[in-house]
Amino acid sequence: MNIFLVVAANGKAGQKIVTELMARGLDVTVAVRQANKTQASQVIIKDLFDLTAADVSNFDVVIDAFGAWAPEALPQHTSSLEHLAAILAPNARLLVVGGAGSLYLDASHTAALKDSDGFPEAFKPLASAMGEGLARLRTLDVDWTYLSPAADFVADGEKKGHYVIEGEVLTTDDKGVSQLSYADYATAVVDIATSGRYHRERVSVRW
């Protein structure tokens, strides 16, 4: 059975992922900077950038739920991935909680959601930083999977118990809506983490 580490687990997505892992009876440890807010009892209290190879050596799957929003911290969306890739055990998987802004608008892969007219200006710096992190991740020597949520990512939305996995292009349901709850996103993350699918690949998740 795989042993899981959720990094930056105190955030909303991180907590949902931990809850889903534990509901399945899986072996879960969390890495958090401050007091643990998750259901997990196995805890490493350390900043992501202070984690060492020894800290993560026993984990088969590391789920990175790190996020940074302050302008001065946005480059950490790249440096955090570089750090984790450098310290993970040779055969470990790295699953990254990603963003929707870098999803492409069509199969040409020339323009992303963040470049579209309706994308909120306030979120463009974050979306760009996360896109740069993904671009760097593609070059790193690590077994990664990057999971982009739907354009409308609903923190407190209901758990419907279903989702659709798509590729690098933003897709919608039959009503033209790209939406997903954090709860169903967490289910998708854990399903992928336990399935061994989508190696060195970015996928998108929506209802």
Name the predicted role of every residue range.
Residues 2-24:
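N-terminal Rossmann NAD(P)H-binding glycine-rich loop of SDR-like oxidoreductase domains
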Residues 29, 83-125:
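Conserved Rossmann-fold NAD(P)-dependent oxidoreductase catalytic core, especially the SDR/UDP-sugar
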Residues 36-91:
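NAD(P)H-binding glycine-rich loop region in Rossmannoid oxidoreductase-like domains
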Residues 129, 176-190, 201:
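Substrate-positioning beta->alpha
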Residues 135-155:
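Conserved beta-loop-beta element that borders a ligand/cofactor-binding pocket
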Residues 163-180:
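A conserved pocket-lining segment of Rossmann-fold NAD(P)-dependent short-chain dehydrogenase/reductase
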